Amino acid sequence: MERIDPDELAIAIKVLRQIPELHPDHEDVRTMKRAASYMYKLIKKSRRAEIRMERQRHDQEIIERTATGSRMRIDDETAGIPLVSTAQGAFAGELITARGCYICKEDFTLVDAFYHWLCPRCAAMSHAKRDQRTDLTGKRALLTGGRAKIGMYIALRLLRDGAHTTITTRFPKDAVRRFAAMEDSADWLHRLKVVGIDLRDPTQVISLTDDVAADGPLDIIINNACQTVRRLPGAYTHLIDGENAALPTAESLGVQALPEMVTFDRISEAHPAAIAGALSSTAVAHHDGESAESALAAHNAASMTALALKAGGASLEAHLAGTAIDAGGLIPDIQANNSWTQVLDEVDPLELLEVQFCNSIAPFLINSRLRPALRAAVQAGARRAYIVNVSAMEGQFSRRYKGPGHPHTNMAKAALNMMTRTSAGEMFETDRILMTAVDTGWITDERPHHEKLRIAAEGWHAPLDLVDGAARVYDPIVRGEAGEDLHGSFLKDYEPSPW
């Protein structure tokens, strides 16, 4: 209603003026009091709602000035480059309504320019950890799942700090394109080795360990690769096409040489043949240049990689337009449901097996079979050797509440934690190997597509980004090189946490 009819309003005013002439106990007076009271409550309720909305708008504007709370950011998409805040100065502003810090849980109102969900003290600590470095010159590192997202940022830290780094991925050519595209790649690309492998296939994992061990002492193992929610095969279409396209020449990229690349058979299949039961055979390694089906132009593959490294590639607007490519180079899965919300009897047996092989069995095989190489590094003069098992809160037993969803990923991470807790003490006492499990923090939202878009539209964003996740994984190595022996711990937000 825009306005009250003037004649009716005049009648109402006339009646109100007559009310005081009646006896206070008159029925008409009581009726008018009830009506006036109801009207006053409605007006008061409406005003409270307006004030609440004004406060929410004020606070949301401050949140959106931050890097992690920006409207351009959704899920784990971070443009493949560091996030940027639009705030001027160290802080984005002051909230009217206090919110709890993601790390320390204390309420705060002063919002950091970068982190929308951290109090000033925890934000300052996180900034310092994001930038910490250590000298790894001459050391060798093996990093699984190093092509994109957290893995890419871990690999960049290792390479920029001087380590000779071997990364594994199911899409090795995409990895080469990504790393070669970095502005400073000429400084370290010659120390990168890319291994195309499917960690869900134990025969390939064993072949990988043999290949790594043959190269001599190994200083660092980071078991980062994992399968959380199985994507539809179509999500990988562009990446698979890119594996059939030729790589650019080193000269065109402005570098002396491309990284060494080794690939195994059938690395890009939807499911490992051994697990699916279709066939089984021995994994065979192929070095770069041996097989080249260039059915599609390399330009298209490079374009898809560039999209994954472009700001806003997976923004809410891009999702709604159907053009989104996330930081991993994947097409978003638009299924109404996925295994993140599935309960015990709903999880597909094949996905159950894949998750166990990738998330816990592959790390077990890698750690056990490469232990002699780690021992050799210490014997050759290294202060310590390192194993970092990238875990998650899903594998923690001490949480007060466990929801019924994704039991298969929970049990895989719990197994990884138990391997760490069981073996870390003995490995340190015997061989001076520091093994820890690390939670990367809340970076990704694994909920089904429609729900993810809904909460993004409402202004929700994960509190941390990919660089924060990488910093948490890298931290035990930095601290170890500084003389602090962290082992047998489950680290959350850089501190030991209950198992």
Task: Show where each model-derived region lies.
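N-terminal alpha-helical interaction blocks
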Residues: 1-98
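C-terminal helical subdomain
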Residues: 3-25, 262, 269, 274-312, ...
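Short cysteine-rich clusters marking metal-coordination/redox-active sites
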Residues: 101-104, 119-122, 387
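Canonical Rossmann dinucleotide-binding motif of NAD(H)/NADP(H)-dependent dehydrogenases/reductases
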Residues: 127-172
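Conserved glycine-rich Rossmann-like NAD(P)H-binding loop of the short-chain dehydrogenase/reductase
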Residues: 161-178, 193, 220-225, 233-259
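Catalytic Tyr-X3-Lys loop
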Residues: 238-364
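Active-site helix of classical SDR
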Residues: 367, 412
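SDR active-site lid
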Residues: 403, 407, 424-425, 429-483
